[in-house]
């Protein structure tokens, strides 16, 4: 039985071309990019190629605006902490209630340890940002705004280009966590007011452990990691040359294939949703039905537990993600669904399916055969959750 992987918002398969591009840099071309000899220069040249490949994907005006990091979490932390350090007279952060923990956990830490005031802008029942509340939060006390480009659970896309323009009116630095958007949405940063952007290679068929932080030219930046002078003094530490090369190749492939792949992926996603809505009663699609990522659907199966659903689907060779976190004492829903005001009885049964170009029509057919029976079994064996 061929496994069906529908958890691509968690991580993606490394593309074969990406792997082949990386392999020489593990053994044959292994020089330290900071070294002056030929081996180092060759590694450094490969890193510069990757920088230009990523520049093309995100539409950066200058390739030095790209700083390579270990991934999205580091990039998010570096951006927010730098924003506060660059504007010490400002002591407030604006973010959303549905950000990734890489942002929200840091904000909570800053509240407790520094007394930083954090404005968590609410969302509506479809996960869309409350623009009036966002406008109200923007004052000259705000150092940095950090709003995700697209939500990892629901796929809802935020109007970050507009949000950045609003932030500029009060002189705040604007950062976006674009980890879920890169490779799925066309991005042209040079035409926006966005100051910083985070991304991670493993979300678009690159390797794990490598990412980047875009820092617009002229935006003040204070390095999170101190040490050597790598990445123009913005990120100390010997560069992960194989990973960076892989990121660059993945960026090149994403730029070449995005439009074609997205059309196919969206059609499969829509077919999956339509099939489940027709075959299974008491099913609800979460998030914005239109303005969302082409590969993502978050579906609530009322009367079942998302974790139990995930477990049984895994036994059928189907990998997906639950929107709930189950412990021996309680069943809690995701902070995203809570922020959306999703009824508890629906939120605990939420399952996220996130597709990629590696999925096929047969995958969708099999999922549509399996899920109705799984839901029926769970509903017969477990009480409907009270909300």
Curated annotation (Swiss-Prot):
Q: Which InterPro entries match?
A: Aminotrans_V_dom, Aminotrans_V_PyrdxlP_BS, Cys_deSase_NifS_bac/arc, Cysteine_dSase, PyrdxlP-dep_Trfase, PyrdxlP-dep_Trfase_major, PyrdxlP-dep_Trfase_small
Q: Where does [2Fe-2S] cluster bind?
A: 326
What residues bear N6-(pyridoxal phosphate)lysine in this entry?
203
Q: Which cofactor does it need?
A: pyridoxal 5'-phosphate
Keyword Transport assigned to the entry: answer is no
Kindly state a single biological-process term from the GO annotations of this entry: nitrogen fixation
Q: Does the keyword section mention ATP-binding?
A: no
**What EC number is given for this enzyme?**
2.8.1.7
Q: Which GO terms describe its molecular function?
A: cysteine desulfurase activity; iron-sulfur cluster binding; metal ion binding; pyridoxal phosphate binding
Amino-acid positions noted as binding pyridoxal 5'-phosphate in the UniProt annotation, renumbered to this chain: 72-73, 152, 180, 200-202, 238
Location of the active site: 326 (cysteine persulfide intermediate)
Query: What's its top-level EC category?
Result: transferase
| Gene3D superfamilies linked to this entry | 1.10.260.50, Aspartate Aminotransferase, domain 1, Type I PLP-dependent aspartate aminotransferase-like (Major domain)
| Keywords, in A-Z order | Iron, Iron-sulfur, Metal-binding, Nitrogen fixation, Plasmid, Pyridoxal phosphate, Transferase
Q: Which domain of life is it from?
A: Bacteria
Instruction: Kindly state which reaction or reactions the protein catalyses.
Output: (sulfur carrier)-H + L-cysteine = (sulfur carrier)-SH + L-alanine
The task this protein performs is described as:
Catalyzes the removal of elemental sulfur atoms from cysteine to produce alanine. Seems to participate in the biosynthesis of the nitrogenase metalloclusters by providing the inorganic sulfur required for the Fe-S core formation.
The Swiss-Prot or TrEMBL record describes its family as follows: Belongs to the class-V pyridoxal-phosphate-dependent aminotransferase family. NifS/IscS subfamily.
Subunit composition and interactions: Homodimer.
Protein name per the record: Cysteine desulfurase
Look up and give the organism this protein is from.
Answer: Sinorhizobium fredii (strain NBRC 101917 / NGR234)
């Amino acid at each position: 039985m061929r496994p069906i992987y529908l958890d691509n918002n968690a991580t993606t398969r490394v593309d074969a071309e990406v792997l082949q591009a990386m392999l020489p840099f593990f053994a044959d071309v292994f020089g330290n990019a900071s070294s002056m000899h030929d081996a180092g220069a060759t590694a450094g040249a490969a890193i510069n190629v990757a920088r230009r490949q990523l520049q093309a994907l995100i539409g950066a005006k200058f390739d030095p605006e790209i700083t390579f990091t270990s991934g999205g979490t580091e990039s998010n932390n570096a951006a927010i902490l730098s924003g506060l350090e660059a504007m010490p007279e400002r002591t407030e952060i604006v973010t959303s209630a549905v950000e990734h923990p890489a942002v929200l956990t840091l904000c909570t830490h800053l509240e407790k340890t520094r007394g930083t005031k954090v404005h968590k802008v609410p969302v509506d029942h479809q996960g869309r940002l409350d623009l009036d509340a966002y406008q109200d939060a923007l004052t000259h006390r705000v150092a940095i705004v950090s709003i995700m480009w697209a939500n990892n659970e629901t796929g809802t896309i935020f109007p970050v280009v507009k949000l950045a323009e609003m932030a500029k009116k009060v002189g705040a630095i604007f950062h976006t966590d674009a980890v879920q958007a890169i490779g799925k949405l066309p991005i042209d940063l040079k035409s926006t007011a966005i100051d910083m952007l985070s991304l991670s290679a493993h979300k678009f068929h690159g390797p794990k452990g490598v990412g980047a932080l875009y820092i617009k030219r002229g935006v003040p930046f204070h390095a999170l990691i101190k040490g050597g002078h790598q990445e123009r003094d913005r990120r100390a530490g010997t560069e992960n040359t194989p990973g960076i090369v892989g990121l660059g190749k993945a960026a090149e492939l994403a730029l070449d294939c995005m439009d074609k792949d997205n059309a196919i992926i969206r059609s499969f996603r829509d077919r999956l949703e339509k099939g489940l809505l027709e075959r299974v009663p008491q099913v609800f699609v979460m998030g914005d039905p239109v303005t969302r990522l082409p590969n993502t659907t978050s579906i609530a199966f009322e009367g079942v537990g998302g974790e139990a659903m995930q477990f049984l689907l895994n036994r059928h060779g189907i990998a997906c993600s639950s929107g709930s976190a189950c412990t021996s004492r309680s069943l809690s829903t995701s902070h995203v669904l809570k922020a959306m005001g999703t009824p508890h009885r629906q939120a605990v049964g939420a399952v996220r399916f996130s597709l990629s170009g590696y999925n096929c029509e047969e995958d969708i057919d099999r999922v549509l055969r399996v899920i109705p029976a799984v839901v029926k079994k769970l509903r017969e064996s477990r009480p409907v959750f009270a909300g």
